[in-house]
From Swiss-Prot:
A motif ('KMSKS' region) lies at residues 619-623. Its EC number is 6.1.1.4. It catalyses: tRNA(Leu) + L-leucine + ATP = L-leucyl-tRNA(Leu) + AMP + diphosphate. It comes from Salmonella arizonae (strain ATCC BAA-731 / CDC346-86 / RSK2980). Belongs to the class-I aminoacyl-tRNA synthetase family. PANTHER family: LEUCINE--TRNA LIGASE, MITOCHONDRIAL, LEUCYL-TRNA SYNTHETASE. This is Leucine--tRNA ligase. Keywords: Aminoacyl-tRNA synthetase, ATP-binding, Cytoplasm, Ligase, Nucleotide-binding, Protein biosynthesis. GO terms for molecular function: aminoacyl-tRNA deacylase activity; ATP binding; leucine-tRNA ligase activity. It is an enzyme of class 6 (ligase).
Length: 860
């Protein structure tokens, strides 16, 4: 081997070897335990960023480790290739989304290879190809036939700039999450998949996911939002229909003093015909933000419709208001208000001078003080006629039973979860496989016309989808009858909901999945990605798996056994204020900084001399110009260094602070390992290790080697604390660097230690370890080498450290054989000069001995 570590030479050579040998290509093998390691597939935006590198390095470390345990490891990669950014980029660069996307895929594929990730490239897929989305289209038509797909007109969040529908989660402060345009409300027909039909199972099966983060499970539980309550029907004077409301607190029903309906409710619309104030209010609501997170904080407004509802138990008339906090698409579009015991209802009633009637006693049994806020806790009823004196559960049941007996109420389980709207009014997505016949009948595209192929050779005007702008594209015939194709495309969450299953059989032509292959590999053993996907992608991913199970394609109930959410990557952020007061963000690479003695940044400027404001560490982003290009770092230090730093700088699930000094430290460590192997191998061949003839120092060093193997194995395999595993290897390396190399057995022990170190580092730094393994004459390629196994015998301590106290004060420490008797320990303590001086001329009155730990001599 050469004396100097030159990553630029060895990395490309090793990568070529992997490519030629197809090292990471796998097939189903019933004789081996399988392990499916998956990182969330990237969107081909053009370049990898450090967030990608962190995600994929964690996955690669786990995959390589599991492979060394002898498992059949699948680690695939592909491209989540449909989506809006491609349309914007195509318009900007005067091209079409397809060529832009395919160019990006080619570029990013090279970047992934440059980082040395051990992917099975034979399974690579891009979700924008008809070979992929044809099966999704076919599956959609099958779901339609099962009654799990329907079309309805619904109020949507419409981004006028992107000309598309946004999910509630994509509306932030009333604006589009992507382009910041003001969002409008619009009624359009859309396709939905009935995820609500699986709400109960999606909820209960969370309990099976023992190895998913609790935070993600809690977010999904809250998102599904199961509640038990009562649906109550009110008659309304002068209105032909009844109003139905749902409540989880029927115990407070006797305190209901008004009803509130959504601005879009038919009752409000009817009242608005003779009420100009209400008509203006309805119009205002139509264009108001409705992202659920904002509902709680926005100002509550309403207008009295003039209608009166009849309380079904008291017969009292209560007013019906139109209010902006009631949504037509949630529940029935109407709610009952109990201002004495619900804070939102209380604020609204206070604002508009509506009746507030308390019906629950305070905890001390007194009437509640409602002068400043509602009493929202459960308690004992009063002011409720025949139900007075009942506590929550008894009151819930008594009132629910009474309403049911009168035929105006029924118990019901409700969900916050809404059906999944999958229509998008965009071009760059999979066409929805439905057609409309001349008589208006809507049917699935016949199987012999699938896939419905998206034309790729298009001209983008930045406004209208090319398939909407081209009337010829939509024209088709079904059984000789003219028909029109659906011109909406699927939400891109459709593609990312089942890709993990297609990886198990990407070339399969007979259907969506080859069940034999899918059931061999699934469920995924570990899925790695950001926590920002907790409710959308990860819920659809679980839902789709259950749909495929019920279609007979897979047998497991859940798609992934373990979920690991990696932390964000942070970097320093700097800006200077421009002439017009605007902030100009400067890359940390271009900042010249001064630090204090603790390493904190105290001053910064850029090459042009601008004084920079340092805003601290924040998530790498384009907006703050603080992203670090992985390619530049790989060219400067090598892929192994970047990978090692990524895994060492922070626990995998915590934020990682990008520090170039830390990268340099990782690079120095690799050079130290290289140097030690070089010096060791330069001395020529090595004799066999004879563990029976080792002296005490050699035994101690060998003990350290095997204790490190045990720790690293536990840290990577069970605890997944990769940073502590690396720290343990570094600590061992420090000891090995100081170990004498004088005798045959010294060198034989060094050979055993280095073969272990190189294998333990292999998942982190595979290129350098591949090379060092060859230099050490390890058997075969390191990619097929077994993980080192700790020798229990070597780890047995032959001596132990005893703390010696005189009258309870520590006076010394002694090393004794593990099997030493109390007499031998006392004798050895008396010989220790630090202890002996306290025993001079005194009598030992009592001895307290804790075997293997402590000797306390009481003297007087």
């Amino acid at each position: 081997m050469q004396e100097q570590y030159r990553p630029e030479e060895i990395e490309s050579k090793v990568q070529l070897h992997w490519d030629e040998k197809r090292t990471f290509e796998v097939t189903e093998d019933e004789s081996k335990e399988k392990y499916y390691c998956l990182s969330m597939l990237p969107y081909p935006s053009g370049r990898l960023h450090m967030g990608h590198v962190r995600n994929y390095t964690i996955g690669d470390v786990i995959a390589r480790y599991q492979r060394m345990l002898g498992k059949n490891v699948l680690q695939p990669i592909g491209w989540d290739a449909f989506g809006l950014p491609a349309e914007g980029a195509a318009v900007k660069n005067n091209t079409a989304p397809a060529p832009w996307t395919y160019d990006n895929i080619a570029y990013m594929k090279n970047q992934l290879k440059m980082l040395g990730f051990g992917y099975d490239w034979s399974r690579e897929l891009a979700t924008c190809t008809p070979e992929y989305y044809r099966w999704e289209q076919k599956f959609f038509t099958e779901l339609y036939k099962k009654g799990l797909v329907y079309k309805k007109t619904s109020a949507v969040n419409w981004c006028p700039n992107d000309q598309t529908v946004l999910a509630n989660e994509q509306v932030i402060d009333g604006c589009c999450w992507r382009c910041d345009s003001k969002v409008e409300r619009k009624e359009i027909p859309q396709w939905f998949i009935k995820i609500t039909a699986y709400a109960d199972e999606l909820l209960s099966d969370l309990d099976k996911l023992d190895h998913w983060p609790d935070t993600v499970k809690t977010m999904q539980r809250n998102w599904i939002g199961r509640s038990e309550g009562v649906e109550i029907t009110f008659d309304v004077k002068g209105y032909d229909n009844t109003l139905t409301v749902y409540t989880t607190r029927p115990d407070t029903f006797m305190g209901a003093t008004y009803l509130a309906v959504a601005a879009g409710h038919p009752l409000a619309q009817k009242a608005a015909a003779n009420n100009p104030e209400l008509a203006v209010f309805i119009d205002e609501c139509r264009n108001t933000k409705v992202a659920e997170a904002e509902m709680a904080t926005m100002e509550k407004k309403g207008v009295d419709t003039g209608f009166k509802a009849i309380h079904p138990l008291t017969g009292e008339e209560i007013p019906v208001w139109a209010a902006n906090f009631v949504l037509m698409e949630y529940g029935t579009g109407a709610v009952m208000a109990v201002p004495g015991h619900d804070q939102r209802d209380y604020e609204f009633a206070t604002k508009y001078g509506l009746t507030i009637k308390p019906v629950i006693l305070a905890a001390d049994g007194s009437a509640p003080d409602l002068s400043t806020q509602a009493l929202t806790e459960k308690g004992v009823l009063f002011n409720s006629g025949e139900f007075d004196g009942l506590a929550f559960e008894a009151a819930f049941n008594a009132i629910a039973d009474k309403l049911a007996a009168k035929g105006v109420g029924e118990r019901k389980v409700n969900y916050r979860l809404r059906d999944w709207g999958v229509s998008r009014q965009r071009y760059w997505g999979a066409p929805i496989p439905m057609v409309t016949l001349e008589d208006g009948t809507v049917i699935p595209t016949p199987e012999d016309q699938l896939p419905v192929i998206l034309p790729e050779d298009v001209v983008m005007d930045g406004i209208t989808s090319p398939i909407k702008a081209d009337p010829a594209w939509a024209k088709t015939t079904v059984n000789g009858t003219p028909a029109m194709r659906e011109t909406d495309t699927f939400d891109t969450f459709m593609e990312s909901s089942w890709y993990y299953a297609r990886y198990t059989c990407p070339q399969y032509q007979e259907g969506m999945l080859d069940s034999k292959a899918a059931n061999y590999w699934l469920p995924v053993d570990i899925y790695i990605g950001g926590i920002e996907h907790a409710i959308m992608h990860l819920l659809y991913f679980r839902f789709f798996h259950k749909l495929m199970r019920d279609a007979g394609m897979v047998t497991s109930d859940e798609p992934a056994k373990q979920l690991l959410c990696q932390g964000m990557v942070l970097a320093d952020a700097f800006y200077y204020v421009g002439e017009n007061g605007e902030r100009n963000w400067v890359s940390p690479v271009d900042a010249i900084v001064e630090r204090d003695e603790k390493g904190r940044i105290v001053k910064a400027k850029d090459a042009a001399g601008h004084e920079l404001v340092y805003t601290g560490m924040s998530k790498m982003s384009k907006s703050k110009n603080n992203g670090i290009d992985p390619q530049v770092m790989v060219e400067r230090y090598g892929a192994d260094t970047v990978r090692l730093f990524m895994m060492f700088a922070s626990p995998a699930d915590m934020t990682l602070e990008w520090q170039e000094s830390g990268v340099e430290g990782a690079n120095r460590f690799i050079k130290r390992v290289w140097k030690l192997v070089y010096e060791h191998t330069a001395k020529g061949s090595v004799a066999a290790l004879n563990v029976d003839t080792l002296n005490d120092d050699q035994k101690a060093l060998r003990r350290d080697v095997h204790k490190t193997i045990a720790k690293v194995t536990d840290d990577i395999g069970r605890r997944q604390t990769f940073n502590t595993a690396i720290a343990a290897i570094m600590e061992l390396m420090n000891k090995l660097a100081k170990a004498p190399q004088d005798s045959e057995q010294d060198r034989a022990l060094m050979q055993e230690a280095l073969l272990a170190v190189v294998r333990m580092l292999n998942p982190f730094t595979p290129h350098v370890c591949f090379t060092l393994w060859q230099a050490l004459e390890g058997e075969g390629d390191i990619d097929n080498a077994p993980w080192p196994v700790a020798d229990d015998k070597a780890m047995v301590e032959e001596s132990t450290l005893i703390v010696v106290q005189v009258n309870g004060k520590v006076r010394g420490k002694i090393t004794v054989p593990v099997n030493a008797t109390e007499e031998q320990v006392r004798e050895r303590a008396g010989q220790e000069h630090l202890v002996a001086k306290y025993l001079d001329g005194v009598t030992v009155r009592k001895v307290i001995y804790v075997p293997g730990k402590l000797l306390n001599l009481v003297v007087g």
